[in-house]
Swiss-Prot record:
Pfam families: Thy1
Residues spanned by motif ThyX motif: 79-89
Family per record: Belongs to the thymidylate synthase ThyX family.
Pathway: Pyrimidine metabolism; dTTP biosynthesis
Enzyme class: transferase
Protein name: Flavin-dependent thymidylate synthase
Amino acid sequence: MKIKLVSYSKDGERIVAIAAKMSRSRKGWDYHEKEMTDDEIETWIRDSITHGYWSVLEHSVYTFSIEGISRVASHQLVRHRIASYTQMSHRFAKPVDKYYKPITPPSIEKRGKEVVDKAYQDAYNYFYQLLEKGVPEEDARYVLPNGVNTNIVVTMNARELYNFFGLRLCSRAQWEIRAIAWKMLDEVKRVHPRLFKYAGPNCIIHENFIRENPITLDDIDNTVFISQRCIEGVTREGIPKCVKNARSILVSEDGVVMGK
């Protein structure tokens, strides 16, 4: 898989901070835009996130190109409804040889790869047999597998990304959507480290609601959690290990699953 942040709100961190401050001030945009310091930006972002003041994060927007994932993963992705999606259509983009690279889960790589390889090849052959019989592409594609590779353009604002990360960075998320989420997090932290400093699975988000000083993913090894257990039932003693296990997923551009 290949995940790339292709566009984003360049001044997103500053915009979020100014919006947060304006909600508590009688002064307008020009004043706060001129007077806002870098330290204030970090403070307003942190306080907005730890107090659940999520609406200000909606002002910063991000567009990703996500390539070489399965239809299984893309179907999970589009369940996050506060977003915009444009996906490759197998009605118009037929799976010709060099572009037909269905995704094989790591559990199958070790147990039944030959079975899946045959199923994928059979589906490919059946697709073209149907086309030869005059079946239109929009109907012939019904025989293509859930694992067929696809590309999708995704646009989310920072608030929805926090919600997406909370659910999909978690070890309970399926491996492929989890790998997508961790790569997307890496991309947004590269351009907006302050805005996504406190992003993480829901165990991190919910913990920060009750802590005086919020924690980050980098603090996980040195943190004693206040929460007795996360919403998935993992005890506070087990949360650090659970997060590290979730973070260990890494998938190369050619689909090889590796440790991180």
